[in-house]
Design a protein with these regions (language model features):
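Short, glycine-/small- and polar/acidic-enriched structural segments
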Residues: 15-199, 209-246
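Alpha-helical scaffold segments in soluble metabolic enzymes
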Residues: 1-2, 40, 168-171, 209, ...
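N-terminal export signals
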Residues: 1-14
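Internal, well-ordered alpha-helical segments in soluble enzyme and binding-protein domains
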Residues: 165-168, 202, 206, 224, ...
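Short glycine- and hydrophobic/aromatic-rich loop-to-beta-strand nucleating segment
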Residues: 110-111, 251-254, 258-259
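Secondary-structure end/capping motifs
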Residues: 260-361
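Soluble non-cytosolic domains of exported or imported proteins
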Residues: 32, 59-63, 78, 160-163, ...
Length: 361
């Protein structure tokens, strides 16, 4: 990503990396499956091999995580891919955040409640007795009409305004002819002219919030879509690679000041993350079951192993029993990915502009 590429001293350090300037580090993450490269780098000793002694700390939500990186309370973190761009443009807290490594690709889905799905399903084409995927948001139109007649709003959850899930959800809705609303200089809610109302919900709260009836669906990373299926509360209607194949989802972010002051530490961190990501995708995902066991622990994602394994081991369940092969639902390094791409930065920036986060002037 253009705005996320290595800058300053980090890019100039010679191939033979010197000793880390700072070796005791604290990295933050959100309880999502795609934090797994950090957990693997820690549990497999890859950080220690680089002379780094890392503490991994779960954060309450994306805003808290981002603010703690900016303040220096965290040395780096698992971040939503658009976050460094949002910081550079001042859409969120103005800061210089760089991303030397992309942690994950694909990995998100859009899930709706059972009641919404039952209405949508009436207009969804069938193939072999099962709904044909990907499912267009056009199937939401009868639901919107029903809500309108009863004087209700269709409320959908996303994880952060300048985030992967907000922009993917908006893209899907608009492609199906449903207006997700706009941000404006005088209205930061993102609901200007909206037919569906989008609001922020922390990832681990997506399922409880839908169960309570506060939202009727959401866009989030795993395992919170598969948990809705397992609990019999909802049905995923789209996975993110159907919108943007191999699109960046999470990055590892640090402040530019940290990278400039600690170039060897930054490079050694990336080396450990590359090893972890390569391990995750090696031999057609052969190591994924072990990775699932690691992140199912309460200190990491803290979800049931079977729920995490649904997506991490190459399959994805839509309606209960409708499990389909999606080997790249979670992708970390296959195809020598990991490098921040200019094209990704451009795509995310166009979404910021499209929905009003970046004004015309």
């Amino acid at each position: 990503m253009a705005a996320l590429a290595l800058t300053g001293n980090v890019a100039q350090v010679a191939a033979a990396v010197g000793k880390p300037e700072k070796w005791e580090l604290k990295f933050g993450f959100i309880k999502l499956t795609d934090m797994v490269p950090l957990a693997v780098a820690y549990e497999k000793g890859y950080f220690e091999d680089e002379g780094l002694f890392v503490t991994l700390e779960a954060q309450a939500n994306w805003k808290v995580l981002f603010d703690r990186v900016v303040s220096g309370e965290l040395d780096g973190a698992h971040m939503l891919a658009p976050m460094p761009l949002g910081a550079a443009t001042g859409v969120i807290t103005k800061a210089e955040i760089i991303s030397p490594f992309t942690l994950s690709y694909n990995g998100a889905a859009i899930t709706v409640s059972n009641s919404v799905w039952e209405e949508m399903k009436k207009t969804v084409p069938m193939e072999g007795g099962k709904p044909k995927h990907p499912i267009s948001a056009e199937a939401l139109k009868p639901v919107l009409e029903s809500y309108k007649k009863s004087g209700k709003q269709l409320n959908l959850g996303m994880t952060f305004p300048v985030g992967t899930h907000n922009y993917l959800l908006r893209y899907w809705l608009a492609a199906g002819g449903v207006n997700p609303g706009l941000y404006s200089p005088t209205d930061a809610s993102g609901t200007v002219n909206a037919q569906a109302m989008l609001s922020v919900v922390p990832p681990p709260q997506m399922v409880p919030t839908m169960e309570a009836g506060t939202t009727a669906g959401y866009c989030v990373g795993e395992p919170w879509n598969q948990q809705a299926v397992t609990k019999g509360l909802g049905v995923p209607v789209l996975t993110s690679e159907n919108l943007w194949p191999n699109g960046s989802d999470k990055v590892f972010g640090v402040t530019k000041a940290f990278a400039d002051k600690n170039p060897n530490t930054t490079i050694r961190t990336v080396k450990a993350l590359i090893r972890a990501s390569a391990w995750l995708d090696a031999n057609n995902n052969a190591n994924r079951p072990e990775a699932v066991k690691i992140i199912s622990r309460p200190a990491y994602v803290g979800a049931d192993e079977k729920v995490i394994a649904n997506s991490m081991t190459g399959t994805f369940e839509f309606e209960k029993g409708d499990k389909r092969p999606i080997p790249d639902f979670n992708k970390f390094f296959r195809g020598y990915y990991g490098m921040p791409y200019y094209s990704d930065a451009i795509w995310w920036t166009t979404q910021m502009r499209r929905w009003g986060h970046i004004p015309e002037q």
